[in-house]
Amino acid sequence: MIFYFTGTGNSLWVAKALSEALGEPLVSIADELHKEKDGWVYPVRPDEKILFVYPVHSWGPAMSVTHFISRLTLNGYTGQSVYSISTCGDECGYTDRLIGKALEKRAISLTAAYSVIMPNNYILLPGFDVDDKDVEERKLQDAPARVAEIIEAIREHGQDALYHTGSMPGLKSYWIYPLFAHLAIGSNSFRVTDACISCGLCGR
């Protein structure tokens, strides 16, 4: 089973490639979150591989993913292989450790973490911008080979080897990421007036 979260399509492309190669069904985390359940329960087979595919946001996992995991139950989980595949513009920091900790709280053990470098697409903070066209094209050309390596590693029950931590991961993932999560993608910028019609758009 492949749980995936995607914003611009990078992680969806990776998830589809993994699904086709490994024969595991896709589950959209965004779609599941919109169902507003008290929790998310899924049966897993004894031989099932469980994958989480998602983007790195400021050197940490997309918050929708950790929110989903915080209320996730895998019925029949007895230690099956669980993999994290994150897409990033350049480096992931300790995203693997953060996702592993989130899973551990649900009594799920992370087997291995992998990463795929894809075009940068975050532009809302100073110093962030999309890649130059040649860099973007190079990343897109390199991505299929990287995904193929990850598929082979999963088939061979490989451990962490195809993951790019980058420089100063502690600073980026344990200091910058929490600030980003609180200030950049929180609800502080929203306000409600009498014009609100409760359409729910602001919560999507």
PLM feature spans:
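Local sequence-structure signature of Cys/Sec-based thiol-disulfide redox active-site neighborhoods
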Residues: M1-Y4, V192
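FMN-binding flavodoxin-like domain, especially the glycine-rich phosphate-binding loop
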Residues: I2, T8-W13, A17-L33, V41-Y54, ...
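Short, charged alpha-helical interaction segments and adjacent helix-coil junctions
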Residues: I185-N188
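Cysteine-centered iron-sulfur cluster-binding motifs in ferredoxin-type domains/subunits
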Residues: F190-R204
